[in-house]
């Protein structure tokens, strides 16, 4: 898949999030990043370059990768109640990074 197509898909997702954030159903903008646009691209690339077995391993790892995203959401919810938004974002991204790092270390040790 060409780089231009990937960039166009990403731009469309960002535009859709921006439009939805301005509607009365603004919370739907939080659902859009969970649409597997980038997962589809990643899975296609892995399958075409490394084969189905690598794709299946990537799918299992992707299932586990929900944990760092959940950590990000919980920490962002918590931090927005006690600090300014920029600091809450930084703290939440740090929590995501730590939990993603732990996930990768565990995955490497177990596989």
UniProtKB/Swiss-Prot annotation:
One of its GO terms (cellular component) is plasma membrane. The chain crosses the membrane at residues 27-47, 59-79, 88-108. Pfam families: GlpM. Residues 1-26, 80-87 are cytoplasmic. Residues 48-58, 109-111 are periplasmic. The keyword Transmembrane applies. It is found in: Cell inner membrane. InterPro entries: GlpM/YdgC (IPR009707). It comes from the Bacteria. This is Inner membrane protein YdgC. The gene is ydgC.
């Amino acid at each position: 898949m060409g780089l231009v197509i990937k960039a166009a898909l990403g731009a469309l997702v960002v535009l859709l999030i921006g439009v939805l954030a301005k509607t009365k159903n603004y919370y739907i903008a939080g659902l859009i990043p969970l649409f597997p646009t980038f997962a589809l691209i990643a899975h296609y690339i892995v399958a075409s370059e490394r084969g189905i077995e690598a794709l299946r391993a990537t799918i299992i790892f992707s299932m586990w990768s929900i944990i760092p995203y959940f950590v990000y959401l919980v920490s962002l919810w918590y931090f927005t109640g006690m600090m300014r938004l920029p600091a809450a974002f930084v703290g939440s991204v740090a929590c995501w990074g730590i939990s993603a790092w732990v996930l990768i270390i565990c995955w490497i040790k177990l596989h």
